[in-house]
């Protein structure tokens, strides 16, 4: 456990950040699951609409440092390729 005042503060901040990041990560995964479900259903219109929603979200999460920018690019590319193949 933290002994100094500054260490206690940092522990509180780290826990607050962890919870905030967990919430964002959960939201990101939910939007990705919606996109995957639309692709698997073969509904091109719904999949395209889901891609339009998830693309800026992935970019935002990469900018905030929640995921790496290459991971965001990889997901966007794979979603777009899967939708194009429908």
UniProtKB/Swiss-Prot annotation:
This protein's GO CC annotations: cytosol; small ribosomal subunit
InterPro entries given in the database record: Ribosomal_bS20 (IPR002583), Ribosomal_bS20_sf (IPR036510)
UniProt keywords, alphabetically: Ribonucleoprotein, Ribosomal protein, RNA-binding, rRNA-binding
Gene Ontology biological process terms, A to Z: translation
GO molecular function, one term: structural constituent of ribosome
One Pfam short name: Ribosomal_S20p
Region (Disordered): 1-27
Gene3D superfamilies associated with the record: Ribosomal protein S20 (1.20.58.110)
Known function: Binds directly to 16S ribosomal RNA.
Family: Belongs to the bacterial ribosomal protein bS20 family.
Name of this protein: Small ribosomal subunit protein bS20
Organism whose genome encodes this protein: Vibrio atlanticus (strain LGP32) (Vibrio splendidus (strain Mel32))
Lineage, broadest ranks: Bacteria, Pseudomonadati, Pseudomonadota, Gammaproteobacteria, Vibrionales
């Amino acid at each position: 456990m933290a002994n100094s005042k500054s260490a206690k503060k940092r522990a509180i901040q780290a826990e607050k950040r962890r919870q905030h990041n967990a919430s964002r990560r959960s939201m990101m995964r939910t939007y990705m699951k919606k996109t995957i479900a639309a692709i698997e259903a073969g509904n091109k219109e719904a999949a395209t609409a889901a891609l339009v929603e998830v693309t800026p979200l992935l970019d935002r999460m990469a900018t905030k440092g929640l995921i790496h920018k290459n991971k965001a690019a990889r997901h966007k590319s794979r979603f777009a390729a899967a939708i194009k193949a429908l």
